[in-house]
């Protein structure tokens, strides 16, 4: 446990020292939420205020960015730079490294989620009318599912360039097509089909249902099954493809 806590501290310190990562992964989602919130202030989406609708979408954007663009690409870069190889030669166990990276991503995502909610509530009068408890549960499941996908992406990528290209190709469409900023039903037919093939759609739907309607797994069974299925599949891929060098 002491080794895990120490590695989490190291990972957080590395994150805070990287101004580029902070700018794009921490500030950009918040600025996007402010932009869309201001642009659509007073509007409605799916029967609720747009600001309330936007909360789950903003958090979905954060989860996707943290999992693929931060964790996945960063892990591939550390492998290319020989950092993982050096860590592999220390007493640090693989599960400690993996756990530290997941917990670090969770801390970053939870911090951004709190800021996301605060911005929408304070600036745009958003309301959380559902169950905060179920919202937290969905968020945690989403964090585990998507960070595991980030590990799988790093393992499947030959090098940093490949990981960066794959992360952008996966994450960017999800951030704009999965009901994050606009209702999926208002999109053209082709985009709706694409959105329903992306896992972030089901995370955002389950999170929005929990936060605005108090819906649990029994009401959003399809969303939960797909998220858990992605978690299992990504876990198998991540374990089989993880390498220190």
Report residues per predicted region.
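Short coil/turn motifs that cap or connect alpha-helices
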Residues: 93-94, 183
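Transmembrane helix-loop junction
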Residues: 37-41, 61, 77, 86, ...
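Transmembrane helix boundary and interhelical loop/hinge segments in multi-pass membrane proteins
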Residues: 15, 67-92
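Alpha-helical transmembrane segments and their short interhelical loops
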Residues: 94-172, 218-228, 232-236
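A short amphipathic helical element positioned immediately N-terminal to and/or at the very start
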Residues: 1-16, 207
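Hydrophobic alpha-helical transmembrane segments of multi-pass membrane transport/permease proteins
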Residues: 14-42, 51-70, 111-112, 170-175, ...
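Membrane-interface capping segments at transmembrane-helix boundaries
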Residues: 239-245
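Membrane-interfacial helix-loop-helix junctions in multi-pass membrane proteins
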Residues: 42-47, 127-129, 175-233
């Amino acid at each position: 446990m002491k080794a895990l806590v120490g590695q989490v501290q190291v990972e957080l310190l590395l994150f805070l020292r990287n101004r580029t990562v902070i700018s794009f992964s921490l500030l950009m989602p918040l600025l996007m939420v402010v932009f869309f919130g201001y642009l659509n202030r007073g509007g409605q989406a799916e029967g609720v205020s747009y600001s309330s609708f936007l909360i789950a979408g903003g958090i979905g954007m954060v989860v996707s960015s943290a999992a693929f663009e931060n964790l996945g690409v960063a892990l591939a870069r550390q492998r290319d730079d020989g950092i993982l190889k050096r860590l592999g030669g220390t007493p640090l166990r693989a599960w400690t490294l993996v756990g530290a990276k997941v917990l670090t991503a969770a801390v970053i995502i939870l911090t951004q989620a709190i800021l996301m909610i605060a911005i929408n509530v304070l600036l745009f009068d958003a309301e959380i009318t559902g169950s905060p408890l179920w919202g937290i549960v969905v968020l945690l499941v989403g964090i585990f599912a998507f960070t595991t996908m980030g590990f799988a992406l790093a393992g499947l990528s030959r090098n940093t360039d490949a990981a960066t290209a794959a992360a952008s190709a996966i994450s960017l469409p999800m951030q704009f097509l999965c009901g994050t900023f606009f209702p999926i039903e208002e999109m053209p037919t082709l985009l709706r089909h694409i959105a329903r093939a992306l896992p972030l759609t089901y995370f955002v739907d389950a999170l929005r249902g929990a936060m605005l309607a108090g819906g649990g797994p029994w009401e959003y069974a399809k969303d939960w099954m797909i998220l858990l299925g992605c978690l299992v599949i990504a876990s198998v891929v991540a374990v089989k493809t993880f390498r220190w060098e």
